[in-house]
Amino acid sequence: MVAHTRADSAPKPTDPALAGARILVVEARYYDAIADELLAGALAAIEAADARATVVTVPGALEIPAAAAILLDTGAYDAVVALGCVIRGETGHYDIVAGESARALMDLSVQRRVPLGNGILTVETEAQALARARVAEMNKGGGAAEAALGVLALKRMADGARPR
């Protein structure tokens, strides 16, 4: 017989491991209407977990990883939520921005052991972006925050900081 244990790291609004957590939200506001929806969803998820958010704004998706790294160096944050949108255009710039921002965020998360939710949308059209960003529809901002919170809960459990 094989023993099996499953750790459920999905954040719950009353999870004491998340209370007071300091979440850094780095948003690219290149597309304001999309950014507004992503941010609303992320902030609602963070508030539901009884965590605290600090929001900083950068010009575009490529600036998000550097801004997150700079602010993580302060030691003031437990997790990061990255929010932005890259819409395919007529040149190859989309591929560079989408790929490099995702790679840099993954590197940041793994190398620094920081929980990170990637809410940078990569889409073909603005309509696709709005559908994914809207809180009432796909709520990808909320999903990114929940991902960061879920990994933070898991990290705290692994570090022994979770109340029993």
UniProtKB/Swiss-Prot annotation:
Binding of (2S)-2-hydroxy-3-oxobutyl phosphate: at which residues?
Answer: 90-91, 132
Q: Which cysteines are joined by disulfide bonds?
A: none
Q: Where are the transmembrane segments?
A: none
Catalytic reaction list = (2S)-2-hydroxy-3-oxobutyl phosphate + 5-amino-6-(D-ribitylamino)uracil = 6,7-dimethyl-8-(1-D-ribityl)lumazine + phosphate + 2 H2O + H(+)
Q: Which domain of life is it from?
A: Bacteria
Any idea of its EC number?
2.5.1.78
Residues annotated as catalytic:
93 (proton donor)
Which InterPro entries does the record cross-reference, listed alphabetically? LS, LS/RS, LS/RS_sf
Look up the record and give one Gene Ontology term from the biological process aspect: riboflavin biosynthetic process
Q: What keyword terms does UniProt attach to this protein?
A: Riboflavin biosynthesis, Transferase
What GO molecular function annotation could you give as one example from this UniProt entry?
6,7-dimethyl-8-ribityllumazine synthase activity
Fetch the Pfam families from UniProt.
DMRL_synthase
Q: Which biological pathway? A: Cofactor biosynthesis; riboflavin biosynthesis; riboflavin from 2-hydroxy-3-oxobutyl phosphate and 5-amino-6-(D-ribitylamino)uracil: step 1/2
UniProt-listed NCBIfam families = lumazine-synth
**What name does this protein carry?**
6,7-dimethyl-8-ribityllumazine synthase
Q: Which organism is it from?
A: Methylobacterium radiotolerans (strain ATCC 27329 / DSM 1819 / JCM 2831 / NBRC 15690 / NCIMB 10815 / 0-1)
Gene responsible for this protein: ribH
